[in-house]
Amino acid sequence: ITATALVAPPVAAAPAAPSAPTALVKKSFMVYSKFTSRQVVAYGGANNVGDLTITQGVVTDASGKNVGTLTAVVRVVAQSPKKDAELRDTQSSITLKDGTIFAQAVNEDPKGKPPVDLHIMPVTGGTGAYASARGTLLMRKIGDKYLMAYDFFVEKDMKASNLSFDTVASKTVTGDAPQGVGDVTLARGVGGDDSYISIATRAGTGIDSIDLQVFTADGSLFARAMSRSKGGAAKAQAYAVLGGTGIYSGYRGELTLDANAKAMRLRLAQPGGNAKPIAWFEDAGKGVTDLAVTGGTFLGVEGEMFQKADRKKKVGDYFATQIAYEEIDGVTPILTMLEHDFETGTMIVSGITTTAGTDGAAVARPIIGGTGDYIGASGQVTSLEESADLWRKTGRFWR
């Protein structure tokens, strides 16, 4: 995947909550993973675009002792320029005894096969001891295993708060894959001016990958969980808070949703220092734009970024996936992932919104991580449709 440099004129950053000094703790370690199962759910898109792959595995230390589990949730974004390769939106998570660590990137891998090349992926968050994690994961194949080298920081000080919800509506949409892989459960909780939307994708028996967006009057928070259940009564679920918008722009941490899905406990760290403004333009991209998948409609495109609206100076490439899900409790959840590839690094933007921005309204999504000059990046990017084939992007980020 190639990209060119971002050169953007300064723009005025939107007002942000006052920043406080933060205490960071560095964590660096290596583990090994070995895939034990790999299941593909095909939806019939050209060149496998839109196909969902769930990979499960075990995590060991250098001595070979089992120390955790791995789950990767992968969607094909586009065909690679290379023969017999494809570009994949890859969400990696490992669960160790003291928490879960999430990473995400668009990776180039052999078509329909496991990864073989070295990948450097942004660490986007975590739970437990890894709450608020931001940094990088280096993943390299060694024999029948993968070396996974983590290098990240976590916030030492986080502020606690609570939210409550009066009503919760949910619905499940099923496909025909074994073990229900790819089935989707949508939920929406509402309490006064606060609400949340969750999208749970079945990753195996008793395993769900869950994306969740909390909406308040002043901003939103985007979170992710890997839920493992052995049956029985419902339990509270911990989520990694990957980023936010509005007054929560740049925030990271952890939230816990209780067993009845009506009470939420949050531990959040706000960014320190001053945010950097950023701006560019994007074309509408090309690719698959209307593929039926379980629970919704999939879009997978790749496109170009420019310094100005005249498109004379290219500043990078981007890759995007988006699923517009079925309506739940009167709203339509739209889950979007964008990887922006600049010459000096990559930036991952993701989140759940209730509009795609094609109605003329600007849409803000969290920055959840990056590589190179954007390692550990947090903040937000706002998209505004200038015309049918041009988008204006403005934002701010901390790192």
Where are the model-predicted features located?
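Secretory targeting and sorting signals
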Residues: 1-15
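Beta-strand-enriched cores of mature, soluble protein domains
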Residues: 20-399
